[in-house]
Amino acid sequence: LDLFSEPQTPAVPQLKFEQVCKILKPLFTSKSILKIGHNIKFDLHFMEQVWGEETLVEPLEDTAVLSYVLNGTEHGHGLDELAKLYLDHKMIAYEEVCGSGKNKITFDRVELDQALNYAAEDADYTLRLYQLFRPRLFAEHQVSVYEDLDRPLINILKEMEDSGIKVNTATLRALSADFELKM
């Protein structure tokens, strides 16, 4: 028993991370391939970190944003909640895969079959939600709200998160005090 080394797990042959990135980048940056995700802004941050550069990923669709346009504040827009609400499916919880508290591990330490099941379920139910929500955009006459207003905000909000924003603290404090009085 060695207290100072990483636990040994059976090795499963895998492609090198750099090799996978080299294969996937052309797919993600191709303008002829539609990318469908849930909370895709998170994925854009990850891809930028992995590739070491800002990468334009278009065309894209985001089921979290679709849900927001169609449902507003009726309920949350997380994948787990939407899968349960619209597809009557309980998703595998991240904590079931990675643990919690002192037993929590990072996703790269998860057994390959568990990681595969978790990721495949996310992809599967994201696509199912897309197939459910996209026709509703047309039926509810919300296409322009989604395509012209909310979907473009994905990249704008990502840039704001990357760069930060300037805030006039005096004005913010005054607004806060005003809101507090009105509440």
Describe each region flagged by the PLM:
Residues 1-138, 149-157:
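Active-site-proximal helix-loop-helix substrate-binding element of RNase H-like nuclease domains
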Residues 98, 143-144:
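Short, flexible segments with low predicted structural confidence
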Residues 145-183:
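Extended, well-ordered alpha-helical scaffold/bundle regions in very large, multi-domain proteins
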